[in-house]
């Protein structure tokens, strides 16, 4: 491993590319699955079930992926995920052509296996550099999502009318992206694979790991931070269509939202090292509050644009910070089960918010959705304050 700047690490650069391809898949799915679902669903409130299928599939896959990572190692497990990405994209394409709503939901559910793998890229990044650079490595790999920010929404927009079936071209292109990912992953060397693999029963029981205050707050920050972001992002294409805004505007808003999610990755790691994890996560909570306040002022393009951009930056600070917190709470031989637990809570929260976003925005409107988002944001802020007080009390002289 190297002590140089993370970007100069060849393995890390290749993993950043894979992260970009992963987010291209995610952003494209968010941009089109709700709209394709709306055109195929028996009733409008079911429009985001394909989006929900993606995250529920991820939740169901977390334990399978943990066992796969432990048995096969990082590289092969990640490549299996990319293979599933190819096949599931083709299944979604067939569902769109055959106008089969439930087949579309099944396709996105299967694609969740890829998502469960991709969510581990950030943890794998920490293994590709030394301990002092770990926060920066995680931050830089998350920054690779900028590739998805640029390609995803534009891919959806450019390929929307490429065939008679709307967005068929996007699904077919995602299958090609999966193949490219398999090829790139082949050239990444994961040092962890050289070590003796551990059983998932090694180390402390998961119940002990889960009871640590730092791990509890890491889960809350990651799960609720992702949940609020997903709640508002998944609803945005539907909300903008209901408000009469063209899809080109939706693509623009999503592009800059995802740029907001990942562009800070170039410096979030440095900010964490300088100011501390909890303070940066606290800024993320504040940005979420500001996002909601702006979203509640109206439904014009500039309000969607600014709110979603700030939502993205807030998510970055919360999610990067939560990842850094989590890595202080487990030992190397506890890695797979601890990471699987975090991702299970993340996917579970995303599943709930994916369904809730479609149901709320189509039945109660954009404003009610934003008012409801205040609750998890407030809970996250209180959790950060609680952990800060725990640390302050433990350092107090006795």
Regions found by a protein language model. Name each.
Residues 1-9, 190-219:
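Juxtamembrane intracellular "pre-TM" segments in multi-pass secondary transporters
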Residues 20, 101-116, 303-317:
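Hydrophobic core of transmembrane alpha-helices in multi-pass small-molecule transporters
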Residues 33, 115-129, 317-330:
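Intracellular juxtamembrane helix-capping segments at the cytosolic ends
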Residues 61-74, 264-277, 361:
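Helix-to-loop junctions at the C-terminal end of transmembrane segments
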Residues 83-98, 287-299:
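C-terminal ends and interior cores of transmembrane alpha-helices
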Residues 105-144:
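Cytoplasmic helix-loop-helix junction between adjacent transmembrane helices
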Residues 330-366:
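A late C-terminal transmembrane helix in Major Facilitator Superfamily
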């Amino acid at each position: 491993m190297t002590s140089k700047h993370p970007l100069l690490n060849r393995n890390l650069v290749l993993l950043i590319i894979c992260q970009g391809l992963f987010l291209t898949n995610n952003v494209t799915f968010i941009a089109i699955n709700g709209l394709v679902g709306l055109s195929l669903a028996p009733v409008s409130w079911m429009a985001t079930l394909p989006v929900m299928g993606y995250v529920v599939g991820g939740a169901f896959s977390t334990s399978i992926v943990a066992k796969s990572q432990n048995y096969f190692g990082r590289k092969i497990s990640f490549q299996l995920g990319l293979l599933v990405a190819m096949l599931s994209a083709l299944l979604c394409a067939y569902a769109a052509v055959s106008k089969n709503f439930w087949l579309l939901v099944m396709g996105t559910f299967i694609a969740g296996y890829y998502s469960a793998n991709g969510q581990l890229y950030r943890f794998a990044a920490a293994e590709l550099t030394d301990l002092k650079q770990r926060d920066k490595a995680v931050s830089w790999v998350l920054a690779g999502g900028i590739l998805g920010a640029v390609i995803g929404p534009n891919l959806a927009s450019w390929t929307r009318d490429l065939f008679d079936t709307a967005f068929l071209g996007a699904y077919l292109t995602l299958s090609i992206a999966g193949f490219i990912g398999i090829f790139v992953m082949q050239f990444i060397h994961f040092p962890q694979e050289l070590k003796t693999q551990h059983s998932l029963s090694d180390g402390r029981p998961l119940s002990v790991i889960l009871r640590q205050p730092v791990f509890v707050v890491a889960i809350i920050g990651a799960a609720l931070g992702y949940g609020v972001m997903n709640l508002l992002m998944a609803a945005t294409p539907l909300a903008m269509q209901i408000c009469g805004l063209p899809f080109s505007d939706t693509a623009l808003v999503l592009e800059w939202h995802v740029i907001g999610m990942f562009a800070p990755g170039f410096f979030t790691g440095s900010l964490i090292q300088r100011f501390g994890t909890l303070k940066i996560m606290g800024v993320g909570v504040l940005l979420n509050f500001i996002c909601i306040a702006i979203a509640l002022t109206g439904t014009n393009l500039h309000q969607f644009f600014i709110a979603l951009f700030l939502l993205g930056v807030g998510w970055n600070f919360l999610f990067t910070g939560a990842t850094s917190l989590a890595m202080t709470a487990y030992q190397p031989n506890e890695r797979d089960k601890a990471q699987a637990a975090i991702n299970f809570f993340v996917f579970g929260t995303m599943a709930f918010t994916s369904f809730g976003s479609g149901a709320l925005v189509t039945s109660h409107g954009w404003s009610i959705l934003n008012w409801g988002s205040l609750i998890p944001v407030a809970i996250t802020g209180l959790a950060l304050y609680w952990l800060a007080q725990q640390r302050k009390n433990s350092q107090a002289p006795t």
